[in-house]
A protein has these predicted regions:
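Conserved small/polar residues in nucleotide/adenosyl-binding loops
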Residues: 248-250
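Membrane-interfacial helix termini and the short, flexible loops that connect transmembrane helices
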Residues: 1-87, 91-94, 98-134, 141-167, ...
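Short alpha-helical packing/oligomerization segments
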Residues: 200-217
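Individual transmembrane alpha-helices with interfacial aromatic-anchor signatures
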Residues: 86, 202-206, 242, 246
Length: 250
């Protein structure tokens, strides 16, 4: 049991929190706003929803850090539960991407008459996989190396190399996102109009979104590392972010 835990047991009895409800409200507003934007180019509702989600994410991160770092609630038993929870979350994310790959392979292996019974559709100009896609793949693999370097430095108590590894990983994540935005801006096909564009942008777009979220998580870990929060035997927040990044690499 953590010496900082004020309770007489190893379990964390969480206090009432407004963030789950506010997060769901923000996500609902964001989704409705996105639909309105797709149909009318009106951004204001989507931006309101996005602002709510960002605010709730920050506050929720803050509360969890306070509970684990300052109040001592993240005992070894609690950390086991957190690991189970993160494992199940990653499993659900794998199934999410399986759905999009399923849609892609269903459309490509059995092309319908609506697209000329050929794959890809005849009017599609494919991206060269040996240019930006290859560069971004190498960037992801390199980021896996740097986050592993940071993790080994953490377990060995080397705070300097931990921070260096996280800086490198965050930088690579930002570069990846920049390349993907450039790729989308110069693509010759749109999201709507055919199944190829829909499956391409949904699968790669959600992958890019996960890279962005992983980068945000690592920025939080970087700030906490600079503040001296992580210890060799107490750093599940870092582990969770590294696991999430491993999902992206797959």
């Amino acid at each position: 049991m953590s010496s900082r835990n004020p309770n007489s047991h190893e379990y964390h009895l969480v206090e009432p929190s407004p963030w789950p409800l506010l997060a769901s409200i923000g996500a609902l507003i964001l989704c409705i706003g996105a639909v309105i934007y797709f149909r009318t180019d009106d951004l204001w509702l989507m931006l309101i929803g996005l602002a709510i989600v960002i605010y709730v994410t920050y506050m929720w991160f803050r509360d969890i850090i306070i509970e684990g770092e300052h109040q001592g609630h993240h005992t070894p038993v609690v950390q086991i539960g957190l690991r189970y929870g993160m494992t199940l979350f990653i499993a659900s994310e794998v199934m999410f991407f399986v759905a999009w790959f399923w849609a892609y392979f269903n459309a490509s292996l059995f092309p319908t008459e609506q697209i000329g019974s050929v794959w890809p559709p005849a009017e599609i100009h494919l991206m060269d996989p040996w240019h930006i896609p290859l560069i971004n793949t190498l960037i992801l693999l390199l980021s896996g190396t740097t986050v592993t370097w940071a993790h080994h430095a953490l377990t060995e108590g080397n705070r300097k190399e931990l921070i260096q590894g996280l800086w490198c990983t965050v930088g690579l994540g930002i570069i990846f996102t920049g390349f993907q935005v450039y790729e989308y801006m110069h693509a010759d096909f749109a999201f709507s109009g055919h199944i190829y564009g829909a499956t391409f942008y949904m699968a790669t777009g959600f992958h890019g979104f996960h890279v962005l979220m992983g980068t945000v998580m690592l920025i939080v870990c970087l700030g906490r590392s600079i503040a001296g929060h992580f210890k060799a035997d107490h750093h599940f927040g870092f582990e969770a972010a590294a696991w999430y990044l491993s999902l992206i690499h797959i």
